[in-house]
């Protein structure tokens, strides 16, 4: 995608602030599930993803940091945390899942949603007081947005993403798709 934007209005990965909410569009894990289940009703999410370009434009003036989820939420959120020099806490039970994925064991559904990639939904951060306005904007585009976590002050030399399931630590086996290994 190539385009123009007003000077100084780009939403980068590095603008998140401690306390910002972590929000995603749509449902996560659909493309990864379809890759492993070719006859799934989710196949179109793999074959013909719908990039959220129009909503990304709406987020100018609201989001403090943003990127698309191409490598899996765990890895892509890590990019925001690193660029912003913050930690992140992600609440597994808040992940927006298609009903097909909701039928899976929580650890399997989380693996698809967090490490699968190719969803091309948006992951963005914003101050909590802007959430109602963003939800209203999303509703006008008939798009779901879900708060999945919060940005935290960095506690160590390296940034980290903490995964929690019902406020208990959650161990993720794979963090995302690697394009060039």
What positions do the PLM features span?
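Internal active-site segments that recognize and position negatively charged phosphoryl groups
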Residues: 18-26, 49-73, 77
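Short clusters of hydrophobic/aromatic residues that line enzyme substrate/ligand-binding pockets
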Residues: 11, 28, 35, 46, ...
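Active-site glycine-rich loop that binds ribose-phosphate moieties when present
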Residues: 1-12, 41-58
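Glycine-rich anion-binding loops of enzyme active sites
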Residues: 1-34, 150
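Short, surface-exposed recognition loops or helix-turn segments adjacent to catalytic cores
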Residues: 34-35, 69
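Short, surface-exposed, charged loop/turn segments at secondary-structure junctions
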Residues: 37-42, 82-84
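Glycine-/charge-enriched secondary-structure boundary and capping motifs
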Residues: 2-8, 61, 66-181
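Short amphipathic alpha-helical leader/targeting segments
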Residues: 33-34, 40, 138
């Amino acid at each position: 995608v190539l385009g123009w934007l007003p000077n100084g209005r780009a939403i980068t990965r590095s603008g998140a602030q401690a306390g910002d909410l972590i929000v995603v569009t749509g449902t996560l894990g659909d493309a990864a599930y379809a890759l492993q289940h070719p006859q799934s009703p989710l196949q179109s999410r793999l074959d013909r993803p719908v990039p959220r370009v129009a909503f990304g434009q709406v987020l100018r003036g609201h989001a403090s940091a943003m990127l698309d989820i191409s490598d899996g939420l765990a890895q892509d959120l890590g990019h925001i945390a690193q660029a912003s020099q913050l930690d992140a806490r992600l609440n597994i039970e808040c992940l927006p899942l298609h009903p097909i994925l909701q039928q899976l064991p929580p650890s399997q559904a989380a693996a698809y949603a967090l490490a699968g990639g190719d969803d091309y939904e948006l992951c963005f951060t914003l101050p909590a007081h802007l959430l109602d306005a963003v939800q209203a904007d999303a509703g006008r585009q008939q798009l779901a947005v879900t708060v999945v976590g919060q940005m935290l002050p960095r506690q160590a030399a390296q940034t980290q993403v903490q995964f929690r399931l019902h406020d208990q630590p959650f161990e993720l086996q794979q963090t995302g798709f690697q394009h060039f290994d």
